[in-house]
Each structure stands twice: as structure tokens, then as C-alpha cells.
Amino acid sequence: MSLVRLAHELPIEAPRTAWLDSIIKGDCVSALERLPDHSVDVIFADPPYNLQLGGDLHRPDQSMVSAVDDHWDQFESFQAYDAFTRAWLLACRRVLKPNGTIWVIGSYHNIFRVGTQLQDLGFWLLNDIVWRKTNPMPNFRGRRFQNAHETLIWASREQKGKGYTFNYEAMKAANDDVQMRSDWLFPICTGSERLKDENGDKVHPTQKPEALLARIMMASSKPGDVILDPFFGSGTTGAVAKRLGRHFVGIEREQPYIDAATARINAVEPLGKAELTVMTGKRAEPRVAFTSVMEAGLLRPGTVLCDERRRFAAIVRADGTLTANGEAGSIHRIGARVQGFDACNGWTFWHFEENGVLKPIDALRKIIREQMAAAGA
């Protein structure tokens, strides 16, 4: 199936159906003009690193290292690279939703310059992630430390950009119930995952591992979200997005990369809905006021609540507050006051009695949330 759209044939701010799940062939800045404002949820950008290689690099046995010497990684000066970076970041910022985020990966050659442009343009840096490579290329000349990592910058569209996706609970669960850190350990792309041409040569010199993209998408997007990659290359972003139930749009100007990416993406089988369910924490659940429990008839004014050991008691009032020891307040405030604490989670502290069994009022909040979900709220 052809995924390719030609940038010059798409209208400015083309409708979603014209570019969704496709590869737009063309320069990234002009191609981005074809996308509407605020049309993508997450951007992953792997721009040229501007490696500034001065000649061939050889191993100790005099064999030549396959390094990045392609024309697309060559710029006349730092000023030219900065101007290029600013242009594509501005274009990306326009199409990114207000609650969207961007990931940019780079090496020490370019990531600091990219970070400066991100901040100057109003993006708000959330994290820098260190990708530690388990199998990095050696430093053959022995004149500096082995370069064993790359850096990712994760940023929201603006400082006040609230509501961006971060699947904290899922990342923690995937990390043996320990908070996931900002240093990630992955091998570079090798073996059967590495795309080769008919001569056995690498299709793309900087192909990223699918595991890296999968973690990025699982951390910062939801099924059905749109992932943009303005430097699509061999299509890792598109392949992972399709497998994980996300939409993608890639921009690439080199036909050999487009051909390889198209074949690769067409061969991907998406995961099922059950496998794509993202674990959420309480912070992701809709807020429920205690008065909602009463309005639903699950508790009545005058009901006596107590803690699970029946040491403290409070009476429910018609206005949704509790009263105990002559003082009135919220379920949280009264729970804290009766214990002499500064704070308390009233939902888990207070219990009601049903058929002789004490149950936390949080069970009633769960019923309300289920009703909200059923109603599509």
C-alpha cells in the first residue's frame, strides 16, 4: 500500500485525511506547512547532528568505519545549522497541540544548540533523557572518552502547557514498580532489526532502535494519538506507532529512505486493543466531589461515618460536609482534625456501614466514576 504523499501536491493546512498515516515527501519545513495548526499530539525529531567530520575514520586494522557523511548532515556553519533548527522547530510548534510534547534526540555535536533554540522559542523543558548504549562504537583514535550515549530533550509546547500526557503509573509498573529514571539503557540498532539494502549495506546510518521509540510513545502518548516525525528516515517512528495503535505522519525527502520505510510499515501488524490498554493511576481518574455521592443517593444526611477501627465518628450533613466534636468541614479536614494530623485522605479514612460491614466511602466514589465512564464523561 502506498503511504507517500508529495508535499507540493498537498494544500496548505490540508485536512487530516490527506496526511494521516502517511509519509510526506519533501523538505520538512515546507511539508509542515501542509499540516493544520494544533494537529499533532507528540513530535519525535531526530534531526541532522551536524557531525562536522573532517575525513575518513579507520579502525586499528585500517578498515574504514561507516560513519555519517551524507549530504543532509552537512552545514556551512553553526549559524546555518541554528537557522535551520529554528525554522523546523517553529514549524513544529505551530502544528503541536497546546497540550502536546516534543522529543528531540541528538549527540554532543548538536543537542545543546537545539536545546537553546527550544527554550528561545518558548518550549518548556520537562526532562533530558540519557540513552546509554549497551554496545557503542569504540573511540578508535584514543584521544577522548568513548562516546556511549545520546541525549533526548522532552519538552511541552509552552510553560503553561498543562494536561500533557505522561503515563507515570505505566512507566513505574514496567520498571518493577520503581520510578523510571532519566537514564535509559538500550543497544544500538543491530541484527535483524537493522534495515539493509540488496548489497548488505545499512539503509540509513542512524536508524534508531524500536525499543527506544516504543518507550517514548508508551510514556507520552495514548492509543489514537498522532505522532509526527519531521525527519522520518527509515520509518522507525511509523512502524512503532502502527504497532502501538497510534497514528503517524512522517516527513522525508530521500526516496531510498521512503521506499524502505514504506515496506517496513506495511509489514507491521498492530497490537490488539487489550494489549494497548495503558495503566493509569489515581491522578488520571476524574475528580469526584463528596456531594456527588450524596446527590446520587449513595449516602444520606445524618449518616454516621467512622474510621475502620471505630475510634472516631462524624455525621454527614446535607451540604456535603462532616461534623465532629462541634466542628464542621470537608471529609479530609475533619478526618485530619479528629486524629490531630495536618492532612488526611478522607476517602480512605472514613467508612460507612452496610449490612454490618464497614466499607470505605472511596467505594462509593468508585461507583460514581463508573457511572461517569458509562455516560462518556
UniProtKB/Swiss-Prot annotation:
Q: Which SUPFAM superfamilies match?
A: S-adenosyl-L-methionine-dependent methyltransferases
Query: For the RAMA domain, which residue ranges apply?
Result: 271-373
Annotated PROSITE patterns: N6_MTASE (PS00092)
Q: Catalytic activity annotated for this protein?
A: a 2'-deoxyadenosine in DNA + S-adenosyl-L-methionine = an N(6)-methyl-2'-deoxyadenosine in DNA + S-adenosyl-L-homocysteine + H(+)
The protein's GO terms of the molecular function aspect are: DNA binding; N-methyltransferase activity; site-specific DNA-methyltransferase (adenine-specific) activity
Enzyme Commission no: 2.1.1.72
User: Is Transferase one of the keywords UniProt gives this record?
Assistant: yes
A GO CC annotation recorded here is: cytoplasm
Which biological process annotations from GO are given for this protein? DNA replication; methylation
Functionally, this protein is described as follows: Overexpression from a moderate-copy number plasmid (10-12 copies/cell) leads to enlarged, branched cells, many with 3-5 genome equivalents. Contributes to the accurate cell-cycle control of DNA replication and cellular morphology.
Family indicated by similarity: Belongs to the N(4)/N(6)-methyltransferase family.
In its UniProt entry, what is this protein called? DNA methyltransferase CcrM
Q: Which gene encodes it?
A: ccrM
